A protein has these predicted regions:
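Active-site acidic-Proline motif in GNAT/NAT acetyltransferases
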Residues: 63-65, 69, 97
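Acetyl-CoA-dependent GNAT
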Residues: 5-57, 63
Length: 128
């Protein structure tokens, strides 16, 4: 996704956020996105990919004070779009159960693949 397309996408999605005047996301290449509030790093999303496979595992870190504003969802959406455009499928996302937010991942099209005491693993596949 080029910078102009990314900027347009974010401008249509972030209206009404308390940080909308200073919030921006940079595509760092290599399936990595960084969100900043002013000069402060707010969060990042990235993917672990295997050169011998079309599978990808998404990862995200978001500072707790920026939760509830849609920044994490935006980071995941951008990463998913990037992975899909690059032909990765399935896409997985793993989190500790205490951070389990089923509705967010369900809204992104994920379903629970596995749940145990240490990890909840979500999976996304293109519907055929």
């Amino acid at each position: 996704m080029d910078k102009d397309a990314l900027r347009e996408y974010l401008n249509t999605r972030r209206q009404g956020w308390p940080y909308e005047d200073s919030y921006h996301v940079d595509h760092m290449g290599g399936h990595r996105f960084v969100a900043r509030i002013g000069d402060e790093l707010a969060g990042l999303s990235y993917a672990e990919v295997n050169a011998d496979s079309t599978e990808a595992v998404m990862k995200m870190n978001l500072k707790s004070q920026y939760a509830e504003y849609g920044i994490g969802t935006e980071l995941l959406n951008l990463l998913m779009d990037d992975l899909q455009q690059s032909g990765f499928e399935p896409i997985r996302y793993e989190i500790p159960p205490e951070r389990y937010a089923f509705q967010i991942y369900k809204n992104l099209g994920f379903s629970v693949e596995r749940r145990d005491e240490e990890t909840v693993r979500f999976i996304w596949r293109r519907h055929k």
